[in-house]
Structure formats: C-alpha cells, structure tokens
Regions:
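Metalloprotease/metallohydrolase-associated module, dominated by Zn2+-dependent proteases
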Residues: 6-31, 45-49, 83-154
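A short, surface-exposed helix-loop junction/capping segment
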Residues: 1-3
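Active-site recognition of the HExxH zinc-binding catalytic motif
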Residues: 70-82
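Short, solvent-exposed loop/turn segments at secondary-structure junctions
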Residues: 35-39, 56-58, 77, 85-87, ...
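Short pre-active-site segment immediately N-terminal to the catalytic Zn-binding motif
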Residues: 40-42, 52-73, 110-112
C-alpha cells in the first residue's frame, strides 16, 4: 500500500479475524491505513483504523505467511479492546517498558489481568495455535483457550 492509502478488510482478512474474535468486532467498520515511515510499526489510534508505518500493510493479510497474519491479529486485538471501552492511549502508557509484550501464563489468571499488549500477544498466539502453527515459545492451545473469553467461531 502507498502512504495515506486506506482500505476496508478483505474477505480473507475477515476470516482471519473470526478465528480469534468470532463476531465480537464489527468488521465492516475496520480500516487498514498506510502511514509514511515513522518509528512505530503499527497502531490503532482511532478505535477501528489500524495504521501501519514502519512496515508496509499487505494488500490482503490472508495472502501473507502465518507470522504476518498473526501480527494482523495482534493489531485487531486493539480494535477489539477499543470496542470494549478500553482507552488505548491511556492503556498503552500503562503497558510501556521492555517487557510490555511478554507474559507468563498462570492458572486462573484472566485476560483482564494482562496489559493490552500482552492481551494482543495472547490473541496472536491463539491464532497461530488454532490454525495449527503454534509458536513454540507460547503457552499451549489448551492454556490459551482457558484465558481467552471468546470461543472459536464455528
């Protein structure tokens, strides 16, 4: 995509989203936007717009390798969080630091006990596990399922 180009989600991207989020996100309103190069990789500044900067947004994330699709899911997690009332800018400030994205699974720990970046990482890991390409460093599918509040879309 070119700088400032903006688009809706493709059918394949909607399918990716449903693997983790079911029907919890109004996908009709989600947009992908390419920003000019900046020090951030991607962000969700306007609740339903995912802005890519450091790297290029794919024309269709369903046509890229599983790892890139999983990062798309990470960004969709922020759209989902915003839909649930999370003020992303404030929550991001609380989630700053070298270990902002790292998490350790613990029995009984709920998703809300993790910061927004850890939640998005759990969504990313869950996506990979559900499609049969688990991250070897991530918790098992069973453990991820225990933490994630949305059951898999049928």
């Amino acid at each position: 995509m070119h700088a400032f180009e903006r688009r809706a989600l493709t059918g394949g991207e909607r399918d990716i989203a449903r693997v983790v989020f079911g029907r919890e996100i109004d996908l009709d309103g989600v947009r992908i936007q390419q920003a000019p190069p900046a020090p951030f990789a991607a962000m969700v500044p306007h609740r339903r717009t995912i802005v890519f900067s450091m790297w290029r947004a794919a024309r269709d994330f369903s046509d890229v390798p599983a790892g890139e699709r999983a990062w798309f899911v990470h960004e969709l997690a922020h759209v989902w969080q915003a839909r649930r009332g999370v003020v992303l800018a404030a929550a991001k400030l609380k989630a700053l630091g070298r270990d902002a994205y790292e998490y350790r699974w613990e029995p009984g720990k709920r998703l809300c006990d993790y910061n927004i970046e850890q939640q998005a990482e759990i969504a990313r890991h869950l996506y990979l596990a559900r499609i049969g390409a688990p991250d070897p460093a991530a918790p098992s599918l069973d453990r991820l399922e225990q933490t994630w509040p949305i059951r898999q879309f049928a």
